[in-house]
């Protein structure tokens, strides 16, 4: 079988497990899209704009482990770069592929459309290098296989996005055939000496410490170490807490799990348990202003074992080339029981999170009642995509059955991320019950991608909280800029359905102003398997979780610190 640059790329994407790639057409990528379509083992999924295309791919990567997005040059790629920055921050291997001008024009110094009006066309590649783990431009078919393999292998190894630029007159040119897929997955093993030393130093560090706690961080999935973390926790016997962005990365029904560790907004008893611990073994954590509640919840470095995806720092010694999965597996085989932290937590009798009792069905709808009814929908096969804002805190409060997942974008924190991410996730995992929790302000940024849920008949259940503004910004710093124009959100579903058109959809838009109306709307949503259901939930502007208020004040205080005289 003969290959072109485009079909080579398609085959490599299929070989790494992709069944879909996301795309927005533009004249510099049309021939490439044609070539990708020739591979019948992968479907081309279309998005409404390039920002959404990037976020859709990011959501797909959460479900499938990797993703690809195809856009046009400059006017497309520069929009997608926002989402690629998010994929970098969230440790997700998204392959961004951009069409590019004909290399004859590039060589001749012609001024072209969709560009800056200059004759240097390297600027997009140079920009991409700052937000990806690898970036390559293909100007000849001979160099295509090596460059394609390089970026894909880098994405899979580093769990970071990569960038590939293909000149429009190169996509259909013949090139070499792809070899075995195994070459793309090869990764350097842990250095045995460094691994053994890290394990022995850790055992020595905790030998005389009984109250040992485990803190699960948001890079645990990227490290491929979720199962290893459970085995280690079971062997250790200590308390296990998750950082906010790592919710669902450790099974909440595990007997060692004590809840979310998030400073002042932690689960009851968790903050005190973590502070009283003799040692904290942090697994792939991210300590930023959000995760530390405005820098108020940072572990004591004298008690900390910092286990990153590829290195371990313990007792002031850094052990490189140690894979987290290998480290935890080896520790689980050698560690002695250390139950002190879990015993201490139990002695506090801190109780469970206070949950709202069922509301009067005729009473005006409130935030707590929405969260209660959403939590009742959770099964081991459910994924909740929680938008930046109070949806974070509502999802944090939910008790997850084993197998349920929650997805956040807490490092990048781009409002509007959740809508295309939920679309992409549902494309990648259509067998799951996919729930989207999003506020009205965030929804307005990326609402168009609901139309693609309609197009592909994806039964995503969307809980849209209509409280007339950016609530998370209100809690951090209020002003008139946090007020938004109200929409008829439920009414949008008729727009997206395009009733009467050649591809009329089956999306449903419903409104809920009471708990009873919400319960009835959920029944309709569960019965609608032919498209998304958007439930517009009306609540008061000041109605939010107590946790958001506390957290917002801490983050606001961190933002308002006096300036320093010197930057790093």
Swiss-Prot record:
Binding site for thiamine diphosphate: 50
Pfam families: TPP_enzyme_C, TPP_enzyme_M, TPP_enzyme_N
A GO CC term assigned to this protein in UniProt: cytosol
Binding of Mg(2+), residues: 440, 467, 469
GO biological process: aromatic amino acid family catabolic process to alcohol via Ehrlich pathway
Domain of life the protein comes from: Bacteria
Cofactors demanded by this protein: Mg(2+); thiamine diphosphate
Gene Ontology molecular functions: magnesium ion binding; pyruvate decarboxylase activity; thiamine pyrophosphate binding
InterPro entries recorded: DHS-like_NAD/FAD-binding_dom, PDC/IPDC-like, THDP-binding, Thiamin_PyroP_enz_cen_dom, Thiamin_PyroP_enz_TPP-bd_dom, TPP-bd_CS, TPP_enzyme_TPP-bd, TPP_PDC_IPDC
Binding site residues for substrate: 27, 114, 473
Cofactor binding note of this UniProt entry: Binds 1 Mg(2+) per subunit.
Reaction equation(s) it catalyzes: a 2-oxocarboxylate + H(+) = an aldehyde + CO2
Its EC number(s): 4.1.1.1
Keywords: Decarboxylase, Lyase, Magnesium, Metal-binding, Thiamine pyrophosphate
Region feature Thiamine pyrophosphate binding, mapped onto this chain: 390-472
Family under the similarity heading: Belongs to the TPP enzyme family.
Subunit structure: Homotetramer.
Note: Rapid and exclusive production of ethanol as the end product of sugar fermentation by the bacterium Zymononas mobilis is due to the presence of pyruvate decarboxylase.
Protein name, UniProt field: Pyruvate decarboxylase
Taxonomic path: Bacteria, Pseudomonadati, Pseudomonadota, Alphaproteobacteria, Sphingomonadales
């Amino acid at each position: 079988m003969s290959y072109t640059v485009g079909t080579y790329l398609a085959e490599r994407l299929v070989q790494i497990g992709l069944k879909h790639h996301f795309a927005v057409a533009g004249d510099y990528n049309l021939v490439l899209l044609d070539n990708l379509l020739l591979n019948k083992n992968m479907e081309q999924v279309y998005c409404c704009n390039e920002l959404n295309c990037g976020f859709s791919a990011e959501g797909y990567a959460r479900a499938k482990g990797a993703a690809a997005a195809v856009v046009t040059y400059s006017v497309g790629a520069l929009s997608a770069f926002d989402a690629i920055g998010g994929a970098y921050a969230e440790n997700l291997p998204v392959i961004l592929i951009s069409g590019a001008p004909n290399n004859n024009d590039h060589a001749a110094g012609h001024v072209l459309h969709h560009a800056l009006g200059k004759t240097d066309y390297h600027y997009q590649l140079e920009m991409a290098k700052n937000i990806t783990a690898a970036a390559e431009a293909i100007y000849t078919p001979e160099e295509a296989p090596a460059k394609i393999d390089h970026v894909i292998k880098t994405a899979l190894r580093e769990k970071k996005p990569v960038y590939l630029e293909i000149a429009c007159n190169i996509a259909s040119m013949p090139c070499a055939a792809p070899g075995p897929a195994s070459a793309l997955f090869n990764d350097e093993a842990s250095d045995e000496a460094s691994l053994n030393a890290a394990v022995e130093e850790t055992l020595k560090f905790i030998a005389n410490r009984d109250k040992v706690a485990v803190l699960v961080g948001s890079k645990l999935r990227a490290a491929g170490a979720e199962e290893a973390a459970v085995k280690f926790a079971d062997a250790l016997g200590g308390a296990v807490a998750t950082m906010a962005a790592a919710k669902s990365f450790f099974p909440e029904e595990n007997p060692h799990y004590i809840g979310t560790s998030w400073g002042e907004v932690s689960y009851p008893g968790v903050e005190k348990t973590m502070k009283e611990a003799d040692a904290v073994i942090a697994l792939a954590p991210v300590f930023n202003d959000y995760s530390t509640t405005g820098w108020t919840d940072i572990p004591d470095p004298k008690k900390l074992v910092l286990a990153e995806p590829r290195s371990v720092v313990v007792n002031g010694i850094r052990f490189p080339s140690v894979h987290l999965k290998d480290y935890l597996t080896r520790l689980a085989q050698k560690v002695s029981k250390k139950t002190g932290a879990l015993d201490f937590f139990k002695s506090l009798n801190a109780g469970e999170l206070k949950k709202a009792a069922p509301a009067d069905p005729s009473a005006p709808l409130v935030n707590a009642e929405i969260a209660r009814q959403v939590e009742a929908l959770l099964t081991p096969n459910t994924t909740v995509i929680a938008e930046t804002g109070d949806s974070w805190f509502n999802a944090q409060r939910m008790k997850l059955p084993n197998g349920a997942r929650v997805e956040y974008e807490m490092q990048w924190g781009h409002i509007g991320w959740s809508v295309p991410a939920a679309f992409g996730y549902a494309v990648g995992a259509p067998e799951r019950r996919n729930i989207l929790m999003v506020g009205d302000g965030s929804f307005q940024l990326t609402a168009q991608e609901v139309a693609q849920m309609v197009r592909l008949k994806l039964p995503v259940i969307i809980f849209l909280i209509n409280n007339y503004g950016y609530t998370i910004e209100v809690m951090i710093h209020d002003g008139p800029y946090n007020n938004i124009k109200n929409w008829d959100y439920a009414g949008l579903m008729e727009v997206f359905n395009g009733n009467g058109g050649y591809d009329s959809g089956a999306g449903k838009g419903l409104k809920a102003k009471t708990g009873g109306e919400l319960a009835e709307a959920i029944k309709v949503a569960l019965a609608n398997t032919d498209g998304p259901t958007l439930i517009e939930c009306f609540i008061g502007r000041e109605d939010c979780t107590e946790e958001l208020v506390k957290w917002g004040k801490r983050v606001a205080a961190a933002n308002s610190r006096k300036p320093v005289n010197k930057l790093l």
